Amino acid sequence: MGYGYVPSSPTDPRASGLEPARPVGPAPGSLDVADVFPSAAPLGTAGTSTALDEKLRRAYYWMVNEAIISPHYDIEFEMGDGAPDTTVNLGETGAALHLPTAPSYSSFMLMPLLTFAVRGRCLLIGGPGRGKTTSAILMGVLAGYPVEQVRRGMQHGHPQLSVTDMFGTPLPRDLVGAESLADIDVAWRSWLGMRVKIIDEYNRIPTRTQSALLTVLADGYVEVYDQLYETGDAAWYLTANDDAGGGTYQVVEALRDRIDITVAALPFNPRFLPGLIQRREGDFRPERHVPAEVVFSAAEHDAISAQIQSVRVPQAVLRRLAFFASQLEVCEHAATQLEYRSKDTARLTGGDVAGLLRRSTGRDRLTDLADQTLSGMSVRAMNAVITYAKAMAFFRGHSDVALEDLRAVLPFVLRDKIQPNLDSPVFASDEGRLLVHDPVSWLRGLMDTACLAYDAAGLDTDDPVGEVLAELHQGLTGVTHAEVRHRLARIESLARSLGYGGKLYGHVADDAMALKYAHQRYSAYMSWLEWDSGSSAGAGP
């Protein structure tokens, strides 16, 4: 088989919804002419096309088995049917070798592919020669572009890269003869219209050009000489040799925040050196052997993005994400007013977040999630987590997001967005010191701890604040004055009960503010009811 071969068998029969083939013969005497000489099958019958989720899986398996040697299955899933767990501890630190019971995946291959599907923004980090650029180029070829066009469209960061070099140059004749900026035409760079955009070594781009790039990433347009070019939806791939923001130029914080997901290239396993030599001797370049079966047209690209957005997120999964996010943001000593007691308040005023966290007493700093981080989750980060969790569920052939999908993608989305508090005693132990350099395992552990706390609190079955909000969101039309008073009394009772715990955990603070929100809505509605009833009573015949 050649490098461009894609097996026709389903990558995951259960996800594909196919039944195993069974040998079935005709009953004696039942053959007729149509059985011996079957007519051509009509167009549009089953088997003439591949479902987009199956096509996405085939693209992944071709990449991981044929294109890039990356035998690192660091995104693990389990069958969940009581299959025996196989884990071996290696070395003096007890490094765990776990053998998953369900299909598991290489993050360096899968996360860029999911970025392609959702048209997100992916940062590939790692040392030189690790395959970052090759992986990004493969994404461009998967979009149907010739290799030469992908390479021409790839932007290379360097200290002299200007805004016009990167985006477009005004025509010289217009610069000479134009009477206003509106008369100047700009020769836009062709890469701006591509569905896959690649910025190699983005941390070597000058700060001024980074600011222009930020506008393109954030708003989807670029401006040169008062002329606008809308770039449209695209999958972005940026590469860097480290994720500390360093390089020739420090990366602008706002630009780093626009990146949806960060993936590290893992080291090459010398066990696979024979395959590497074979590729070198055969001059094999994976980007030139991409099978047509895994290339996505523009229409398919639009369709797969729309299908991913239609994947449902069950309330139980969403509540766990909300609980996790709540734990990270609260900072009890950041302000006096409840709404301002967040790490963001302290950061904006130049405060020492780690010092403020040390002042919190009465907490177990080893289990308190807020103590381990210097920042919380932004709205953009929450949206990215949900989008990639949907993409993971879609890739695995599911119509609903499972908690394991969320757990798989969350560390890669938050890797560059949640900063650890190294003053926390969690990082003082031998195991904690390993987590300092392993942000993916640290963030996954945070999520696991949050889920345990969520289950211990029984919030799936006992969520009175959620009931209040659900009742409010049904609308106020027809709700009587007496019913409003009853609901306000319940809200006030719930608010008082929140103070019985004595400790201001993140979900408690968020529940308190949610109750205040509902109280304001009902109070305003009751004022309107009183005004309306008074107006009606004072009206003459």
Regions found by a protein language model. Give the residues of each.
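Short glycine-rich substrate-engagement loop in P-loop NTPases that contacts/grips substrate
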Residues: 158-192
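Walker A/P-loop
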Residues: 113-158
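Terminal-proximal interaction/regulatory segments of ATP-powered molecular machines
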Residues: 401, 408, 412-541
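Canonical AAA+ ATPase core
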Residues: 173-176, 201-209, 217-310, 390-392
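Interdomain "pre-motor" coupling segment immediately N-terminal to P-loop NTPase/helicase cores
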Residues: 3-75
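Conserved beta-strand position immediately N-terminal to the Walker
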Residues: 122, 197, 235
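Pre-Walker A (pre-P-loop) alpha-helix and adjacent loop at the N terminus of AAA/AAA+ ATPase modules
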Residues: 51-127
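Basic, amphipathic alpha-helical bundle interface domains used for macromolecular binding and assembly
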Residues: 101-108, 286-424
